[in-house]
Amino acid sequence: MARGDQQRGEGGQNRGRRDRNAPEERVDSDIVEKLVHINRVAATVKGGRRFSFAALMVVGDQKGRVGYGHGKAREVPEAIRKATEEAKKTMVRVPLRESRTLHHDGYGRWGAGKVMMRAAPPGTGVIAGGPMRAVLETLGVQDVVAKSTGSSNPYNMVRATFEALKVQSSPRQIAAKRGKKVGDILGRRADGASAPDAIEG
């Protein structure tokens, strides 16, 4: 293969190898699939070591539904397929404000991984890195400021992000839970109530 053809096959730009930390995105019908992480694992068996691959996938419809999955197989494509199937089965719905951002701040923790997410005004974009960005983008979030601390393990970061998303509640959901009107909840938020106050107060 000629050098020019090889460069075109890599996207027309000589960028070298793809950043292994950047999620690989695929679109399947209405579902966006992102490969967050893949690694080779070894198991000691009689006669030596057996190698396989473990994949971490995130899928979502970019309309408020998202899921994650883990798959292991002796070949990379099969590991990705298993992880994708599991992710689709575990999809959850998260309420979004104006279909673009979170309703309130969110905090999550899993293992040694901690994440913090804040709603942001239009035009902010998704300010988040690695695994967190993959989850938020497949969910459909367009404006958010997110930060992770502690463990950089992608599995911990993804789980911590989902823990933070679990506490997201729309004004309608909070009003129904408390037996109040939506206007009362919105008025309280306008007065500067924090996310924990809005949910637990």
Swiss-Prot record:
- Disulfide bond residue pairs: none
Question: InterPro entries under this entry?
Answer: Ribosomal_Su5_D2-typ_SF, Ribosomal_uS5, Ribosomal_uS5_bac-type, Ribosomal_uS5_C, Ribosomal_uS5_N, Ribosomal_uS5_N_CS, Ribsml_uS5_D2-typ_fold_subgr
Instruction: List GO BP terms, alphabetically.
Output: translation
Domain S5 DRBM, first and last residues per copy: 31-94
Keyword hit for Secreted: no
Q: What residues form the membrane-spanning segments? A: none
| Pfam families listed in its UniProt record | Ribosomal_S5, Ribosomal_S5_C
Annotated segments matching region Disordered: 1-27
- Domain of life per record: Bacteria
User: Example GO molecular function term?
Assistant: rRNA binding
Q: Which UniProt keywords apply?
A: Ribonucleoprotein, Ribosomal protein, RNA-binding, rRNA-binding
The residues forming the signal peptide are none
Offer a single GO CC term for the protein. small ribosomal subunit
Its assembly, as annotated, is: Part of the 30S ribosomal subunit. Contacts proteins S4 and S8.
Similarity field: Belongs to the universal ribosomal protein uS5 family.
Q: What does this protein do?
A: With S4 and S12 plays an important role in translational accuracy.
User: What's this protein's name?
Assistant: Small ribosomal subunit protein uS5
Query: What gene does this protein come from?
Result: rpsE
